[in-house]
Amino acid sequence: MHPRFQTAFAQLADNLQSALAPILADHHFPAMLTAEQVSTLKNTAGLDEDALAFALLPLAATCARTDLSHFNVGAIARGVSGNWYFGANMEFLGATMQQTVHAEQSAISHAWLRGEKGLAAVTVNYTPCGHCRQFMNELNSGLDLRIHLPGRAPHTLRDYLPDAFGPKDLEIKTLLMDEQDHGFTLTGDTLTQAAITAANKSHMPYSHSPSGVALECKDGRIFTGSYAENAAFNPTLPPLQGALNLLSLNGYDYADIQRAILAEKGDAALIQWDATAATLKALGCHNIDRVLLG
């Protein structure tokens, strides 16, 4: 078990601990539960879906990287597949505050990058900020997405974001978590191809500036992130943050990164290179390359 889980795990009910122990035994537990695992945990612990999600929130919150605020937020995105995806907030010392990943963004990006096709609900331990409410409005689940908070009745995103502005106001038909493939040819080595594949998945209907990042760890593991734009622009999630989020959720640290590649178009309206390189260097990674999509 990764050390970050130990304190929260010890506070769980005994029957839930017994069911979770084999799942968490892997130091690189992927911070997700399959539909089958969720069903087993519900039956073993005698909890319904909502109660189980609340019980697991402290585990998700331990995944936070909050070197600046020291305020851990955890979230669980529940996919329409039945799979559950942990998320937690991330802050990057030496970078800028704009590089921060919110817990809801973390869980949603986690689900999207693992191939989830849509979300039924998001469970979070603190009220979603306006930034996250707007981010969630880009999803193909729209305003019907259920939001679950401790001590409150569940509500839809529509309740939390009245008079919402979103992609439909801009006549955008393809939404975040809809399947997309922009068709860029895979070239280069394995890491380069992973970055291009991530760029092919980009949700960028506003700038038409695809980008993807691939991070290679010292043990050979590769994590990728795809660019996810938002109708309100500022809640957009850069590809590096998606990749760093997956890396951290899987129990790796920034020091484990040995190489990074950004894939983007050289003539795009928006360029990720400077911000990507600056953030990676702040985290100690200097082996950074760029491949141009064509």
Swiss-Prot record:
Matching entries from SUPFAM superfamilies are given as: Cytidine deaminase-like (SSF53927)
MF-aspect GO terms: cytidine deaminase activity; identical protein binding; zinc ion binding
- By its UniProt entry, which InterPro entries does this protein fall under? APOBEC/CMP_deaminase_Zn-bd, CMP_dCMP_dom, Cyd/dCyd_deaminase_Zn-bd, Cyt/Deoxycyt_deaminase, Cyt_deam_dimer, Cytidine_deaminase-like, Cytidine_deaminase_bacteria
Annotated positions binding Zn(2+): 102, 129, 132
Q: Name one Pfam family in it.
A: dCMP_cyt_deam_2
Q: Which domain of life is it from?
A: Bacteria
The protein's matches in HAMAP family, at most eight in alphabetical order, are given as:
Cyt_deam (MF_01558)
Q: How does it assemble?
A: Homodimer.
Q: Any idea what this protein is called?
A: Cytidine deaminase
What species does this protein belong to?
Salmonella dublin (strain CT_02021853)
**Upper lineage:** Bacteria, Pseudomonadati, Pseudomonadota, Gammaproteobacteria, Enterobacterales
> In the UniProt record, what gene is named as encoding this protein?
cdd
